[in-house]
């Protein structure tokens, strides 16, 4: 008489909703940035495209690195139509035979980046204004495999330009993001910064400012500094 073994039903692996995972990653990243008094990131479709193309490449089993396939984050966002002056990229891979619930996968990805000093620094990049995210799923050998690419960037067109004019009779000394400059009397100089500008006047003219685009700073005859609204230099 044949002996029949009991049939054990194997639970199907959980399947995370990819679109929801991506949205949750952005939401969690913005909450993390807000807790450090940093601006929220706006999702950009070109950055999404660059992230998705690279995540799909990694999911083929290619080398898991930022230069996989002989490209760099800067090259990839450029090919997607994004002219960047700041680019940071985070990669992560999570896999399990049991799969992941939607919130679980999003939470796991974000926590992995927070726990890594380099990735954490990227998440808190102060000069980034936009983001792209892609999570690509690959099922193989009984494994639910997820590849995530996060991009944080700032467009070249978002560069801040500002002018400094020296209307005094003495040379004016100042620093822009730590770099020192000297401006002779009756001269002007235009600066452009992709990163958030930090303007520090030293010597007779003193004051610290965070210039906005197209603002003008004038060193007056008495050494004081006048800040003028965009277009204020004429």
Explain the meaning of each model-derived region.
Residues 12-77, 125-132, 136:
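Short, well-ordered surface patches within globular domains
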Residues 1-7:
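Bacterial N-terminal signal peptides
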Residues 194-206:
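A short, solvent-exposed beta-strand micro-motif common in secreted/extracellular proteins
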Residues 160-171:
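Asparagine-centered strand-capping/turn motif at beta-strand->loop junctions
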Residues 178-196:
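Intrinsically disordered, low-complexity Pro/Gly/Ser/Thr-rich segments with frequent PxxP/GP/PP motifs
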Residues 151-161:
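Short domain-boundary/entry signatures in modular proteins, especially
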Residues 206-234:
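Extracellular beta-sheet/turn segments enriched in Thr/Pro/Gly and aliphatic residues
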Residues 73-153:
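A well-ordered secondary-structure block
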């Amino acid at each position: 008489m044949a002996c029949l073994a009991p049939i054990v039903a194997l639970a199907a692996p959980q399947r995370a909703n990819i679109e929801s995972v991506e949205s949750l990653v952005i939401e969690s990243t913005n909450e993390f940035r807000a807790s450090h008094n940093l601006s929220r990131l706006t999702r950009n479709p070109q950055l999404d495209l660059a992230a998705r193309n690279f995540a799909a490449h990694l999911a083929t089993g290619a080398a898991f690195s930022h230069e996989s396939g002989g490209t760099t984050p800067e090259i990839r966002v450029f090919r997607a139509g994004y002219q960047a002056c700041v680019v940071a990229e985070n990669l992560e891979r999570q896999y399990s035979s049991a799969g992941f619930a939607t919130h679980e996968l999003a939470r796991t990805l974000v926590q992995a980046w927070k726990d890594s000093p380099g990735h954490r620094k990227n998440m808190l990049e102060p000069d980034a204004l936009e983001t792209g995210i892609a999570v690509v799923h690959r099922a193989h050998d009984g494994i639910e495999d997820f590849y995530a690419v996060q991009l944080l960037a700032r467009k070249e067109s978002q560069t801040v330009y500002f002018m400094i004019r020296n209307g005094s009779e003495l040379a004016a000394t100042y620093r822009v993001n730590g770099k020192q400059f000297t401006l002779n009397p009756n001269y002007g100089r235009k600066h452009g910064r992709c990163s958030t500008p930090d303007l520090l006047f030293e010597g007779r003219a003193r004051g610290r400012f965070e210039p906005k685009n197209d603002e003008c700073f004038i060193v007056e005859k008495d050494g004081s500094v006048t800040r003028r609204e965009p277009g204020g230099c004429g």
